[in-house]
UniProtKB/Swiss-Prot annotation:
<dbReference type="GO" id="GO:0000976">
    <property type="term" value="F:transcription cis-regulatory region binding"/>
</dbReference>
<feature type="region of interest" description="Disordered">
    <location>
        <begin position="1"/>
        <end position="39"/>
    </location>
</feature>
<comment type="subunit">
    <text>Homodimer.</text>
</comment>
<dbReference type="InterPro" id="IPR054129">
    <property type="entry name" value="DesT_TetR_C"/>
</dbReference>
<dbReference type="GO" id="GO:0003700">
    <property type="term" value="F:DNA-binding transcription factor activity"/>
</dbReference>
<dbReference type="GO" id="GO:0006355">
    <property type="term" value="P:regulation of DNA-templated transcription"/>
</dbReference>
<feature type="DNA-binding region" description="H-T-H motif">
    <location>
        <begin position="61"/>
        <end position="80"/>
    </location>
</feature>
<dbReference type="InterPro" id="IPR036271">
    <property type="entry name" value="Tet_transcr_reg_TetR-rel_C_sf"/>
</dbReference>
<keyword id="KW-0010">Activator</keyword>
<protein>
    <recommendedName>
        <fullName>HTH-type transcriptional activator FasR</fullName>
    </recommendedName>
</protein>
<comment type="function">
    <text>Transcriptional activator that plays a central role in sensing mycobacterial long-chain fatty acids and regulating lipid biosynthesis. Activates the expression of the genes encoding the fatty acid synthase (fas) and the 4-phosphopantetheinyl transferase (acpS), whose products are involved in the fatty acid and mycolic acid biosynthesis. Specifically binds to three conserved operator sequences present in the fas-acpS promoter region.</text>
</comment>
<dbReference type="InterPro" id="IPR050109">
    <property type="entry name" value="HTH-type_TetR-like_transc_reg"/>
</dbReference>
<keyword id="KW-0805">Transcription regulation</keyword>
<keyword id="KW-0238">DNA-binding</keyword>
<dbReference type="GO" id="GO:0005886">
    <property type="term" value="C:plasma membrane"/>
</dbReference>
<feature type="domain" description="HTH tetR-type">
    <location>
        <begin position="38"/>
        <end position="98"/>
    </location>
</feature>
<dbReference type="InterPro" id="IPR009057">
    <property type="entry name" value="Homeodomain-like_sf"/>
</dbReference>
Length: 228
C-alpha cells in the first residue's frame, strides 16, 4: 500500500471513530473524572477515614483505599508517600474539627454556666456528627506510634487548654488547681458522650448534655470566681 493510501486509510478510521490497535490514541480514564489536586486530596482523606475506622490501621491497605476512591495506587502515592502519612493526615483533620468546635463554642458566651453547657455540647456534637473522628481519636489502636500518640494528645490537650484559660481568667485558683478542673471537665464530657453514643443514644442529646452539665456544675459552682 502506498504512503498516500495509508494516510487516507488513517483519516477514514479517525473520522469513523475507529482506531487500529497500534494507533497512538489516549486510553479513556477508567478510574473516574480527573479532580483538582486539593479536591482529590480531600476525597482521599474521606475514603481513607472510612477504611481506617472499618479496618484499623494495621489491617487497612492502600490498595483498598485507592480502589474505594476510584484512583490508581500511584495516584494515591502522589498525595501521600506512605500509609502512615495518610493516617496522620486523616487524624489531623478530625483533631482540627474537634478543637475548633470547642473553641468556637466557648467563644459564644461569657456566662459561666452557659460556657460549661456549650463546652459539653461541643463534645456531644463532635461524637454524634463525626463519629469516625471520635473512634480515631479516643479509641485509637495505633497509639504505640509516637506521631499518632502526639496527634491524640494534641486533641485532648488543646481542649483542656481552652477550658483552662477560661477557668484561670474567671477564678482565683492557682494554675495547677485550675488545670485539674479543666482536665476533669474534658474527661467527663468525653466519657459521658462516649457512653451516650455506645449505648445507642438511650436519651435525647439535649437531656444527656444537661445531665452532664448539672453534675459538673455542682462542683464548679463552689469554685471561687473573680467575676460572674
Amino acid at each position: 500500500m502506498s504512503d498516500l493510501a495509508k494516510t487516507a486509510q488513517r483519516r477514514a478510521l479517525r473520522s469513523s471513530g475507529s482506531a487500529r490497535p497500534d494507533e497512538d490514541v489516549p486510553a479513556p480514564n477508567r478510574r473516574g473524572n480527573r479532580l483538582p489536586r486539593d479536591e482529590r486530596r480531600g476525597q482521599l482523606l474521606v475514603v481513607a477515614s472510612d477504611v481506617f475506622v472499618d479496618r484499623g490501621y494495621h489491617a487497612a491497605g492502600m490498595d483498598e483505599i485507592a480502589d474505594r476512591a476510584g484512583v490508581s495506587k500511584p495516584v494515591l502515592y502522589q498525595h501521600f508517600s506512605s500509609k502512615l502519612e495518610l493516617y496522620l493526615a486523616v487524624l489531623h483533620r478530625h483533631v482540627e474539627n474537634l478543637v475548633s468546635g470547642v473553641h468556637q463554642a466557648l467563644s459564644t458566651t461569657t456566662d459561666n454556666r452557659q460556657r460549661l453547657h456549650v463546652a459539653v455540647q461541643a463534645f456531644f456534637d463532635f461524637i454524634e456528627h463525626d463519629s469516625q473522628g471520635y473512634r480515631l481519636i479516643f479509641e485509637n489502636d495505633f497509639v504505640t506510634e509516637p506521631e499518632v500518640a502526639a496527634q491524640v494528645r494534641v486533641a485532648t490537650e488543646s481542649c483542656i487548654d481552652a477550658v483552662f484559660a477560661l477557668i484561670s481568667a474567671d477564678s482565683g485558683l492557682d494554675p495547677h488547681r485550675a488545670r485539674m478542673i479543666a482536665v476533669g471537665l474534658v474527661g467527663m464530657s468525653v466519657d459521658c458522650a462516649r457512653y451516650w453514643l455506645d449505648a445507642d443514644k438511650p436519651i435525647s442529646k439535649s437531656d444527656a448534655v444537661e445531665g452532664t452539665v448539672q453534675f459538673a456544675w455542682g462542683g464548679l459552682s463552689h469554685v471561687p470566681l473573680t467575676r460572674s
